[in-house]
Swiss-Prot record:
InterPro entries: Pantoate_ligase, Pantoate_ligase_C, Rossmann-like_a/b/a_fold. It catalyses: (R)-pantoate + beta-alanine + ATP = (R)-pantothenate + AMP + diphosphate + H(+). Its EC number is 6.3.2.1. Pathway: Cofactor biosynthesis; (R)-pantothenate biosynthesis; (R)-pantothenate from (R)-pantoate and beta-alanine: step 1/1. GO terms for biological process: pantothenate biosynthetic process. It is found in: Cytoplasm. This is Pantothenate synthetase. Homodimer. Disulfide bonds: none annotated. The reaction proceeds by a bi uni uni bi ping pong mechanism. It comes from Leptothrix cholodnii (strain ATCC 51168 / LMG 8142 / SP-6).
Length: 286
């Protein structure tokens, strides 16, 4: 496995692949990798086969962090990450410095569709999806993959990026990787490392709240808004500060109508809440 830090070295490393018309699968990450990231790399490898090339990027993207968020304390663990990526099937790691990817202020940005990007995460983290779309579009332009793999744990992000690829007619197949969970059900996340021992145990309450909410919505008997408000109240009583707990249509993340719920329309429960100093997200389809 090769590790490169500059655009010139990346392009040189990929030149033989392009000359041979090989398939490139790309897995963008911010590093501090866990088994969920490695599963995405394995999925990329499986998609392109032994003859393909799997590229992973490691870059903590300042554009998607608000000033009060955890950009400065987000762990940078390149040496450890590289040790994990090689046996997972990665061929090439692109780990640029900020000045390499943004040599001057990034004044041209990708503004995602507000109908999707200003809901939920976009509402509570203004500018987040603009930062995500801008860096991913830039990385797509640099790497020029035929396949890209993103985790379904970031459910709304995956939807936004799929729409971006579609809207710009990019020749990229976007794959979603299933959320991996610890043995007790906690969704794997780089930010789980911020949790203390007691918080780590308590963190299971978020997925439990989503599961209960989804079940209550499917059972009917109360309006969706009432059930969502009750779920937030219950989680708040357990010491959390919820941004949202909601059930939405999988197609557009809009609230389902009562008739759609009764008809068994595919739904997803999504939640974001702060436990102590750590903001966690999760989702469950059902």
């Amino acid at each position: 496995m090769q590790i490169v830090h500059t655009l010139a070295d990346l392009r040189a490393a990929l030149a033989p692949v392009r000359r041979s018309a090989g398939t490139i699968a790309f897995v963008p990450t911010m590093g501090n990798l866990h088994e969920g990231h490695l599963a995405l790399v394995r999925q990329a490898r499986e998609r392109v086969g032994a003859a393909g090339t799997v590229v992973a990027s490691i870059f903590v993207n300042r554009l998607q962090f608000a000033p009060h968020e955890d950009f400065d304390r987000y762990p940078r663990t390149l040496a450890r990450d590289a040790e994990l990526l090689a046996p997972a099937g990665c061929d090439l790691v692109f780990a640029p410095a900020e000045a390499e990817l943004y040599p001057q202020p990034q004044t041209f940005k990708v503004q995602p569709d507000p109908a999707l990007a200003e809901l939920l995460e976009g509402h509570f983290r203004p500018g987040f999806f603009t930062g995500v779309c801008t860096v991913v579009m830039k990385l797509f332009s640099i790497v020029q993959p035929q396949v890209a793999v993103f985790g379904k744990k970031d459910y709304q992000q995956l939807m936004v990026l799929r729409r971006m690829v579609e809207q710009f007619a990019l020749p990229i197949e976007v794959l979603g990787g299933e959320t991996l969970r610890a043995h007790d059900g906690l969704a794997l996340s780089s930010r789980n490392g911020y949790l203390g021992a007691a918080e780590r145990e308590q963190a299971l309450q978020l997925s439990a709240a989503l599961r209960d909410l989804l079940g209550a919505v499917r059972a009917g008997g109360a309006p969706l808004e009432t059930l969502e408000a009750q779920a937030c109240t219950a989680l708040r009583a357990q010491g959390w500060l919820p941004d949202y707990l909601c059930v939405r249509r999988r197609t557009d993340l809009l609230p389902p109508g009562a008739d759609e719920i009764a008809a068994g329309l595919p739904l997803v429960a999504l939640g974001a809440a702060r436990l102590g100093n750590t903001r966690l997200i999760d989702n469950l389809e059902g």
